[in-house]
């Protein structure tokens, strides 16, 4: 009986804690959003800017969001257009611009700056 009870307790604890152990980095987006995960050679990039810019509209349109602690981002409610999207942040150099449109998931790769001087050229303190 003790063994059954201890097994039952173990399984219950496992089921309770399992979702917290999962690295669920998927970002849900709809037809007018951009979203994804930003990573670098050092893993998920928390607190960096994701910039989406277009000149396909009557005026230039830019939205900037910040990644969460798992590197996830969501740029919501964008007008339909082709956007240049890139990453900027402390200790990074600007990533290459990627063209995309709303409604698509886009994972981005941040580029770690080789030294503090180069990083300051992109993101001064």
Label each region the model flagged:
Residues 36, 50, 67-75, 108-110:
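Glycine-centered loop-to-beta-strand initiation motif
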Residues 8-18:
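Bacterial N-terminal signal peptides
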Residues 45, 74-82, 90:
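Short Pro-Gly-centered beta-turn/loop motif in secreted/extracellular proteins
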Residues 22-27, 100-123:
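Extracellular beta-sheet/turn segments enriched in Thr/Pro/Gly and aliphatic residues
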Residues 32, 40-56, 80:
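Short, ordered, surface-exposed loop/turn motifs in non-cytosolic proteins
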Residues 28, 55-72:
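Short, acidic Ser/Thr/Gly-rich low-complexity loop/linker segments typical of extracellular
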Residues 55-60, 82, 86-99:
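A short, solvent-exposed loop/turn motif at the edges and junctions
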Residues 17-33, 37-43:
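Beta-strand-rich domain onsets/edges
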């Amino acid at each position: 009986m003790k063994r059954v009870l201890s097994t039952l307790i173990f399984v219950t604890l496992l089921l309770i804690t399992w979702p917290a152990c999962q690295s669920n980095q998927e970002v849900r987006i709809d037809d007018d959003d951009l979203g994804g995960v930003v990573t670098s050679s050092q893993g998920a990039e928390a607190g960096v800017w994701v910039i989406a810019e277009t000149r396909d509209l009557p005026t230039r349109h830019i939205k900037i969001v910040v990644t969460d602690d798992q590197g996830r981002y969501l740029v919501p409610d964008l007008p339909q257009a082709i956007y240049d999207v890139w990453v900027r942040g402390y200790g990074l150099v600007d990533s290459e611009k990627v063209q995309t449109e709303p409604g698509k998931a886009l994972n981005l790769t941040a580029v770690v700056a080789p030294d503090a001087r180069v990083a300051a050229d992109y993101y001064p303190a």
